[in-house]
A protein has these predicted regions:
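Pyridoxal 5′-phosphate
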Residues: 1-326
């Protein structure tokens, strides 16, 4: 099995669940306290809570925030849907757009009267990098970031998407300081989500070498049939995003899966929504074009012959699909 979709869906191996992580209001919860200390050591935040990683869960977080909220349209599907739901209830959201090159338009933050900004250090699907440090020069808002694929120490609050980290839709984990959010009572904390999330983060490993190799091989093989929505130099070093002319990504995704090669079009693909990349559409492309997008991410090491094999199979399947579509 060759997983090139690990940033969209990763499966935690050798899951171990102990009764030690069952929380009680009447006895010490030493194992759980140890977990919270490990999070603090890794990320520097003093407080932790769990929440439903869904539009309803994010809506609950919005309602806890005492202030004006802005959201980058490059965030997770659940967060975007929560923003729309929040607006339907009569509240206001300031939306920060993407440029045609896939970068967050940080200049839209200038002169905005906002207190909280949902902005991650990368855009979903394309994994185009965003400088939280630069964003802080343009706004005094507290910045709340998804740190599942990349952690930026400049974020004021971070959260983790457990479905993408462990392959199970347990609660999300939120880390923060001060009194931005309320803490949960013992009986409402999803301690298993906290444990499994930490296990995944401690075992998270990225391959920084494969991007350049795959990029070269794909260009060489596909030639004029490959194109790029975003500059590869602007994306996370362990990710690669491109488009293939004349086919829908889902056709290639399904075909390659039969060869145990797993790739993605984006969140709409990995979450089972059967939707093309919303991010590409937010960049100004139409829905049809967004169906061409393909995302790779790199964790495991691969030998040169394995890379060649993947590229050869991808090229063969691409030509077959394209011939059938013509």
């Amino acid at each position: 099995m060759i997983k090139l979709n690990s940033l969209q869906y990763s499966k935690l191996q050798n899951i171990e669940i102990l009764n030690d992580f069952s929380l009680s209001a009447l006895t010490p919860n030493d194992s759980f306290e140890t977990l919270t200390l490990e999070y603090k050591k890794m990320f520097g935040f003093n407080k932790l809570k769990t929440f439903s990683f869904s539009k309803e869960g994010f809506l609950g977080l919005f309602l806890e925030l005492k202030g004006k909220i802005a959201i980058s349209v490059g965030e997770s599907e659940a967060l975007i849907e929560a923003g729309k739901l929040y607006e339907s209830l009569g509240f206001h959201i300031t939306w920060i757009n993407l440029n045609k090159d896939g970068k967050v338009n940080l200049f839209e933050l200038e002169n905005q009267n906002i207190d909280f900004l949902f902005l991650s250090s990368y855009v979903m699907d394309t994994f185009v990098k965003t400088s939280i440090e630069e964003a802080k020069k343009l706004t005094s808002a507290k910045i709340i970031s998804n740190a599942s694929a990349n952690f930026d120490k400049n974020s004021d609050v971070v959260f983790f998407d457990n479905y993408k980290l462990i392959g199970f839709n347990t609660s999300g984990v939120l880390l923060f300081n001060d009194e931005i959010f309320s803490l949960l009572e013992v009986g409402k904390i999803d301690s298993l989500a906290v444990k499994l999330c930490l296990d995944a983060l401690k075992n998270q490993n990225f391959n920084y070498k494969l991007k350049a190799i795959f990029l070269e091989k794909l260009k060489e093989k596909l030639q004029e049939n490959i194109y790029f929505f975003v500059n590869s130099n602007d994306t996370l070093e362990y990710s690669l995003h491109f488009g293939l002319k004349g086919i829908k990504a889902r056709e290639l995704i399904r075909t390659l899966a039969l060869n145990n090669i797993f790739i993605s079009n984006g969140e709409g693909c990995s979450l089972g929504l059967s939707k093309p990349s919303r991010i590409i559409q937010n960049m100004g492309y139409d829905e049809q074009t967004s169906r061409n997008a393909i995302s790779f991410s790199f964790i495991d090491d691969m030998k040169n012959e394995d890379i060649e094999k993947v590229v050869d199979i991808l090229y063969l399947k691409y030509k077959q699909i394209k011939a059938l579509n013509d």
